Swiss-Prot record:
Forms part of the ribosomal stalk which helps the ribosome interact with GTP-bound translation factors. Belongs to the universal ribosomal protein uL11 family. Keywords: Methylation, Ribonucleoprotein, Ribosomal protein, RNA-binding, rRNA-binding. One of its GO terms (biological process) is translation. Gene3D superfamilies: Ribosomal protein L11, C-terminal domain, Ribosomal protein L11/L12, N-terminal domain. Part of the ribosomal stalk of the 50S ribosomal subunit. Interacts with L10 and the large rRNA to form the base of the stalk. L10 forms an elongated spine to which L12 dimers bind in a sequential fashion forming a multimeric L10(L12)X complex. One or more lysine residues are methylated. It comes from Deinococcus deserti (strain DSM 17065 / CIP 109153 / LMG 22923 / VCD115). It comes from the Bacteria. It holds the Pfam family Ribosomal_L11_N. GO terms for cellular component: cytosolic large ribosomal subunit. This is Large ribosomal subunit protein uL11. Transmembrane segments: none annotated. One of its GO terms (molecular function) is large ribosomal subunit rRNA binding.
Length: 144
């Protein structure tokens, strides 16, 4: 077991990581090979379009590293499905978009590996709650 010197969590655009900030300074302070990471990350996420991908990089004492990519943030998936550039500044007053229940289930399926929900139904309710907090109304929800 190699000794871990640091764990860095970043959110990067898929296939477009560069050694510039935030990647360079975050990895540079641990002495990890920045170019090696950006090449590996870009190769692994090239098929994800322009999504923002959270990544957790574990850096070891010998300056080697491993990284785990996660699914895009829920807010990004909701904005994309509803066709929004950003959520509502006042979600309880101003509604900025609509999602139907099928879209909510689709987002829940995408996020399922990263959620601690026991079922797709529970994951869908989590997605619906996040959408409501962004000022997006949900249509056709079974329990709404």
């Amino acid at each position: 077991m190699k000794k871990i010197t640091g764990i860095v969590k970043l959110q990067l655009p898929a296939g477009k990581a560069t050694p510039a900030p935030p990647v360079g300074p975050a990895l540079g302070q641990y002495g990890a090979n920045i170019m090696e990471f950006t090449k590996a990350f870009n190769a692994q996420t090239a098929d994800k379009g322009d999504a923002i991908i959270p990544v957790e990089i574990t850096i070891f004492a010998d300056r080697s590293f491993t990284f785990i990519t996660k699914t895009p943030p829920m807010s990004y998936l909701i904005r994309k499905a509803a066709g929004l550039s950003k959520g509502s500044a006042t979600p309880n007053k101003a509604k900025v978009g609509k999602l139907n229940w099928e879209q909510v289930l689709e987002i829940a399926k995408t996020k399922m590996p990263d959620l601690n929900a026991g079922s797709l139904e529970a994951a869908a309710n989590t997605v619906a709650g996040t959408a409501r907090s962004m000022g997006v109304t949900i249509e056709g929800a079974p329990n709404a």
